[in-house]
Each structure stands twice: as structure tokens, then as C-alpha cells.
């Protein structure tokens, strides 16, 4: 009898399963259409789903909707009389989550009687309308799809031309066109934020081991590598201009993910019936599972990391007063490491909360952002050997509470001319303590300051469409740093020209600079009598003059080839005051220099980049990039040297394919190959190191040596299964799938009297399971 019941149960399960497999699951696709400059809602725009031959017309509120669309990937064509047509490829519908879009249309200079779609706008039309050159728009799809990306925006950017990793694979640090990673600006929701990464690497660092911002939380965002528009200040090498995704304002949805990095959860939905919404996403670290497993061959030296983070948005639209938004990003991390000789405890945290208001009138768009942030870093080191057991060798506490306000006004005179002006006010508070052990085993105080200072930025810029094929921007950015009264006026200009045969020529110039952390300015140097000075308090930010030109040729609507050349001249770079000093801030990614600095250094970067790209369509895409570049710096002795980031060349090949299985299911495979020249370094003088029992570098060969080529292959694959009201994904993202041993630095081993090689991470497989419902 039990056997018969069991057989009957199996038959029922089989019938239900076959029924589920045979269903054609559907989903809703909807969104809002707005003017690109003024954000005014656009009525009577048509949205066509190409393959399905369906059409929707936006209503008086700019909204459109398709109901019960079979789940698949679709291309959309959006058009409106008097506006340029836009084609968006690869919109993916799954049964577990609705797709809600905000589509921006750019007003045409001339109204044509008949308009045809001639370009793919989903990557070329940047989120910022004033960005005309060296900018790439991206969304969560890229960060999730690209192999080795780990759902991290910075790791994803390694696929772009001119971008390479700085060294070890355990950090998402990126080098943009040979510049130091510390020159990168992070912006979120239209305002600057501190470094949004876990396990950061010292003061001024812009990176970490794990990003606090999961790619699934992002809306369309921009990544810039040169000649940024005038509304971007305090960035020298590049800009991540990120935007959070808004929650679904009609339906409550949930997301869960379990991986070897962390446990993720998400929830979003409507607030009442007024069109308001919320979205919240959090993550709790399970990184220790990866380190303790036998999946990777890694000596962790009792390294115990933990992290957690959370981000949210609340969107509150009104009928006449615009849209009010609340948003936040919170994260903290700690590591505990104990060896036979030392105990090391590191703690870091970041909390950012923002309030946005934006409102559109007929020709005006007005946006205000108010944010408050709190960033802290703590480190405690203790000696654990001999008679000095328990002796504190270093104790630091860096705390940065900050208040920022940004206000921008955009005025669109007509379909040819738009201006924008704005102000950014930053109140930068600090509480800094840095105690280090002296040669006499006494803690010496190198930093003990608390207070606040201000950073003021003003800008104005103009966008002029000279014809339907030519547009240009011109702008000015000015800043003043009240801690030492540093000030500068930075001009910006760009030009964009399209040809009738599908070619695009773009060029731009700009002056850019970036402040150092307050701790760099206030660091103390002691004299033998115990008195101290703060010699670096009055150093100015170094300036970079960017010159860039590119030519892009469309092969078809899905494929393009782009060639871009650039020159960057850096002046007033902080360097060591000593004539034969070797320190330049261009060679550092983080940390406080112990040297006395002055603005007497120079730098120069030049390069050529090639991009060949097929946008995602028909379940297939590829991205191939190659870069040749040269990065040099000059110290007080006027001799040009390689920067440590002068890899000479870098390349990337990324390809992906999705295979449809039975109805509603698919398998995706993505492969990425990364190649670059090795970092430059100063060799160790082994003979002198042995004689002195410590590391001695041969500075007569400053940065003349180069490590072997760095290369690795990343692989990701996933299986996606759509059910009636949920979508399940199972897969793995494997970094360095071939287990390549890349040398990242060498050190002198005094015990064995030899030079040792230190390698980047081995094969790292991140297995995950994700559910959306």
C-alpha cells in the first residue's frame, strides 16, 4: 500500500512538472518616457517591441505598459515626433520580476518627415547629457553578465579600454590610463561619496576587496575616463557616476541570493497608491566559508574577515512639487589576524544618507541633493613575541563625518541650446589619531587632530547643438579648499560630430584635480627636541590636463569599432622635497606619505585604445579592447621615470552566449581574458640587503624593472529556470580559471637570504543560487 501511494505521488509530481514546463509564462513591461535635458514627461511617444510587433503609446504622464508579454529578451524602439529615435537592445523579461524602465529621449534639431532608427542608444547615449567623450554607460546587466565581475562595478570596468587592475586580484583597484587609482571619483545619486568598498587600503584609497554596492541595486550609470563635464569636480583619473534603482511602485517583489561571498536579500514595492515606492537590499558576509574551504589553495595566515552592508531608496513623487527621494548606503567590516609575532585588528565603516528633490517645469529642471556621511577606519597592531608580548606597535583611528549639499539648475532655451549651473558645498569634519611605535618602544603621536574644514565647488556649462549631427559643450569648474586656501579654475570643452555613413568623431579637453584626505595635510613630523611641524598642510592638489580624441564607426546597429587617443599632462604633483627623493603621489594608491612634500612634480600619460563591440542581441555579445600607453613621472631632479602603473599595454576579450533550453529556461556562458604588461618596480639590492639584514632597494634603477606579463582567464556560467511567479538562477563565477600564477611583487627574505616572489590570487570560484519572486 505504501508503495502504491509513493507511485501515485510520483505520477502527480510528474503531471504538475510537465504542466509547469509547458506553460508560456508572461510578465509585465512598463516604464516612463522623459525629455533628456529637462526630465519633463513625454506624452504620445510610441514604444514598439520589435520581435513581438507590439506597440504602446505613452499617456499624459509619460507612462506606457505592456501586459502579459511572454518571457524572453526583446528589443525596443522608442520614437516621438520632434525627438530622436532610440533603440534599446536585450531587455530581459523573467517571470520573477517586472521590468520598469525610465527612457530618455533627446529632442531633435530638425523635425524629419520620416525617421528611421539608425543607432543603438542604450550604450552610446550616456546618462549625463553633457558627456560627449570618453564615457561609457552601464547597467546591472553588464556587472552581472561579465565573467569575473562578481557583481562589482569596478571589477566590471576592467573590460573597458584603458582600464587595468593595479596589482593583486584580491582588490577591485583600477588603473585608468596609467593614473594612480587614488585619482578616481565616486559619485552616488548626483553627489560625491567616500570610498564605497569593504576592506579598503589606507587613506586616499578608492578601492577594496568587496564592493558595498551590489550591481542589482544600480540603475543606468556612467563611467568616465577623460575630459569630464564641468559638473564633475574632485576627480583626476576617472569617475564612477552611480545611480540607485528605484523600487517597483505597483507590485511587491523579493530577491534572495546565497553565494560563497555572502547572503543577499532584497525587497521592493509600492507605498500606498500614489506612485511612491521603496527598495532595500542587504548582504551578510559568508566570506569565511570560502577561505576555510578546500575550494581554493590559499594560505590565509589566520585571516578572519567579516562584512555586512545595506542600501535603500524611497521615492515619493508628488503631483505639483516634484519628486522627493531618500536613499542610503551602510556598510562595515572587520578583520582579525593573529600570527606568531603579531596581532592585527582592522575595522572600517561607511554610512551615507541622502535626500534628493527634483522638479521639472516647461524648460527648467532643478535638482537638490543633501547628504550626510560618516566614514571610519581603525587599526590596532600588537607584538606577540618575546618580552614585548602585548606591546601596541600601532594604533590609528580615522573618523570623517561629512555634510554635502549640491544644487543644479538646467535651463533648456530650445532644441539647440541648454545650460546648467550648480554649486557643491562640503563640510568636512575629522577626528584623527595615529600612534606608531618609535625605535625606543614608545608610542609616538603622528596625528591628533579634530575639527572641520570646507570645500566649495562652482560650475557652469553649455550644451549647443550646432546641427542635427554636431553638438558641443563648454564649461568651467572652480573649487576652493578652505583648509589651506587652495583654489583653481578648470575649463572643460568637448565636441561630438556624426557622419551620414555612421561615423562619430569626438574630442575633448579639460583640467582636473583631486584633493588628498585631510590626514595627509595634517600629518606631523617631529624634530629631535620634540617639537613638530605639519609640512604638508599647504600642498595643493596636482592638476591633470586631459586631451582626447576618438573616432567610432558603426558596422551595423549592433556592432561598432572605436579608436581613441589621449594625452594627459600632470603638473604641480606632490613629490618629495629632497633632490634625489623617489616619492611621487602618482605611484601610490593609498596611505599617508611620511615625506615632506611640495608641488614640484610632473607627470605625462599618452595612449591609444581600440574597442570592438557587439551589443547584446540574439543571445550573443562580445567586447574586445586593446590599449597601448606610456605613463611617466618626474621628481625634483628632473629625470623622467616609469610610474609603477606603466604597464605599456593592456587587452581584454569578453564573449558571452545564452542557450535556450526548453521553454522558459536557459544556460549562459561568459568568458573573459585579461592581459597587461607587468607593473614597473625598483629591484632589490640583494648584496646590500644581506649585509644590513633588511630590504635595500637599488634606486639607481628606479622603476626600470618590470614584472612578467599579467594575464588570467575568467569564466562564468549559469542556469536560469523560470517558474510561474519566480525565477531561479544557479551558477558560478570563476576568476583565474586556469590557476595562473601572476607575480605582483617581490620581497627580501632575511631568514633565507633570498628574494621571494609573491603571487596574485589562485583560482577563485564563487558559486551562487538566486531567486526572484
Task: Say what each PLM segment does.
Residues 622, 674-694, 710-714, 718-773:
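C-terminal beta-signal and adjacent terminal beta-strands/loops
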Amino acid at each position: 500500500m505504501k508503495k502504491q501511494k509513493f507511485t501515485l505521488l510520483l505520477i502527480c509530481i510528474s503531471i504538475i512538472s510537465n504542466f509547469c514546463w509547458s506553460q508560456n509564462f508572461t510578465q509585465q513591461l512598463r516604464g516612463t518616457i522623459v525629455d533628456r535635458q529637462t526630465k519633463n514627461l513625454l506624452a504620445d511617444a510610441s514604444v514598439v517591441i520589435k520581435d513581438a510587433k507590439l506597440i504602446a503609446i505613452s499617456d499624459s504622464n509619460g507612462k506606457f505598459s505592456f501586459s502579459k508579454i511572454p518571457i524572453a529578451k526583446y528589443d525596443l524602439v522608442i520614437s516621438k515626433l520632434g525627438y530622436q529615435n532610440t533603440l534599446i537592445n536585450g531587455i530581459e523579461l523573467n517571470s520573477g520580476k517586472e521590468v520598469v524602465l525610465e527612457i530618455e529621449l533627446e529632442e531633435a534639431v530638425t523635425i524629419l518627415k520620416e525617421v528611421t532608427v539608425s543607432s543603438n542608444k542604450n550604450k552610446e547615449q550616456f546618462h549625463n547629457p553633457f558627456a560627449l567623450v570618453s564615457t561609457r554607460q552601464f547597467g546591472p546587466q553588464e556587472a552581472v553578465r561579465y565573467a569575473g565581475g562578481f557583481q562589482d562595478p569596478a571589477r566590471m570596468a576592467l573590460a573597458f579600454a584603458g582600464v587595468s587592475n593595479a596589482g593583486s586580484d584580491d582588490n577591485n583597484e583600477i588603473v585608468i590610463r596609467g593614473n594612480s587609482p587614488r585619482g578616481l571619483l565616486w559619485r552616488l545619486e548626483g553627489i560625491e561619496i567616500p570610498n564605497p568598498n569593504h576592506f579598503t587600503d589606507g587613506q586616499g584609497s578608492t578601492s577594496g576587496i568587496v564592493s558595498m554596492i551590489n550591481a542589482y541595486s544600480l540603475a543606468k550609470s556612467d563611467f568616465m575616463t577623460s575630459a569630464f563635464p564641468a559638473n564633475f569636480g574632485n576627480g583626476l583619473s576617472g569617475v564612477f557616476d552611480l545611480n540607485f534603482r528605484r523600487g517597483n511602485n505597483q507590485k511587491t517583489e523579493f530577491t534572495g541570493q546565497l553565494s560563497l561571498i555572502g547572503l543577499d536579500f532584497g525587497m521592493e514595492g509600492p507605498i500606498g497608491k500614489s506612485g511612491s515606492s521603496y527598495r532595500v537590499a542587504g548582504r551578510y558576509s559568508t566570506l569565511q566559508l570560502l577561505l576555510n574551504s578546500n575550494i581554493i589553495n590559499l594560505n590565509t595566515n589566520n585571516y578572519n574577515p567579516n562584512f555586512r552592508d545595506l542600501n535603500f531608496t524611497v521615492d515619493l513623487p508628488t503631483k505639483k512639487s516634484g519628486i522627493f527621494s531618500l536613499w542610503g548606503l551602510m556598510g562595515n567590516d572587520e578583520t582579525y589576524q593573529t600570527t606568531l609575532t603579531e596581532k592585527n585588528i582592522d575595522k572600517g565603516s561607511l554610512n551615507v544618507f541622502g535626500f534628493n528633490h527634483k522638479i521639472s517645469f516647461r524648460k527648467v529642471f532643478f535638482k537638490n541633493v543633501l547628504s550626510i556621511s560618516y566614514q571610519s577606519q581603525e587599526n590596532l597592531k600588537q607584538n606577540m613575541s618575546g618580552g614585548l608580548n602585548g606591546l601596541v606597535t600601532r594604533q590609528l583611528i580615522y573618523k570623517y563625518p561629512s555634510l554635502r549639499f549640491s544644487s543644479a539648475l538646467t535651463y533648456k532655451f530650445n532644441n539647440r541650446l541648454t545650460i546648467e549651473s550648480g554649486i557643491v558645498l562640503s563640510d568636512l569634519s575629522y577626528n584623527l589619531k595615529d600612534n606608531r611605535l618609535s625605535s625606543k618602544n614608545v608610542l609616538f603621536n603622528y596625528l591628533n587632530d579634530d575639527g572641520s574644514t570646507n570645500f566649495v565647488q562652482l560650475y557652469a556649462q553649455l550644451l549647443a547643438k550646432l546641427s542635427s549631427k554636431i553638438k558641443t559643450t563648454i564649461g568651467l569648474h572652480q573649487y576652493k579648499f578652505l583648509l589651506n586656501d587652495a583654489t583653481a579654475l578648470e575649463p572643460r570643452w568637448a565636441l561630438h560630430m556624426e557622419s551620414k555613413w555612421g561615423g562619430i568623431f569626438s574630442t575633448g579637453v579639460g583640467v582636473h584635480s583631486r584633493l588628498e584626505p585631510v590626514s595627509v595635510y595634517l600629518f606631523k613630523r617631529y624634530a629631535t627636541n620634540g617639537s613638530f611641524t605639519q609640512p604638508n598642510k599647504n600642498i595643493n592638489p596636482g592638476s591633470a590636463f586631459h586631451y582626447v580624441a576618438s573616432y567610432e564607426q558603426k558596422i551595423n546597429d549592433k556592432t561598432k569599432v572605436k579608436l581613441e587617443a589621449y594625452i594627459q599632462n600632470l603638473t604641480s604633483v606632490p613629490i618629495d622635497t629632497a633632490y634625489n627623493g623617489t616619492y611621487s603621489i602618482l605611484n601610490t594608491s593609498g596611505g599617508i606619505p611620511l615625506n615632506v612634500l611640495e608641488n614640484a612634480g610632473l607627470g605625462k600619460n599618452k595612449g591609444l585604445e581600440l574597442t570592438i563591440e557587439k551589443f547584446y542581441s540574439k543571445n550573443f555579445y562580445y567586447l574586445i579592447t586593446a590599449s597601448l600607453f606610456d605613463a611617466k613621472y618626474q621628481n625634483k631632479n628632473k629625470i623622467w621615470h616609469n610610474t609603477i602603473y606603466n604597464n605599456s599595454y593592456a587587452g581584454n576579450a569578453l564573449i558571452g552566449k545564452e542557450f535556450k533550453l526548453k521553454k522558459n529556461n536557459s544556460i549562459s556562458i561568459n568568458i573573459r581574458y585579461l592581459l597587461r604588461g607587468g607593473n614597473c618596480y625598483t629591484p632589490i639590492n640583494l648584496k646590500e640587503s644581506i649585509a644590513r639584514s633588511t630590504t635595500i632597494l637599488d634606486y639607481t634603477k628606479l622603476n626600470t624593472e618590470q614584472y612578467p606579463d599579467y594575464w588570467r582567464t575568467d569564466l562564468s556560467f549559469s542556469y536560469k529556470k523560470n517558474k510561474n511567479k519566480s525565477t531561479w538562477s544557479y551558477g558560478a563565477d570563476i576568476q583565474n580559471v586556469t590557476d595562473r600564477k601572476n607575480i605582483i611583487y617581490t620581497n627580501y627574505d632575511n631568514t633565507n637570504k633570498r628574494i621571494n616572489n609573491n603571487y596574485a590570487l589562485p583560482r577563485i570560484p564563487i558559486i551562487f543560487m538566486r531567486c526572484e519572486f
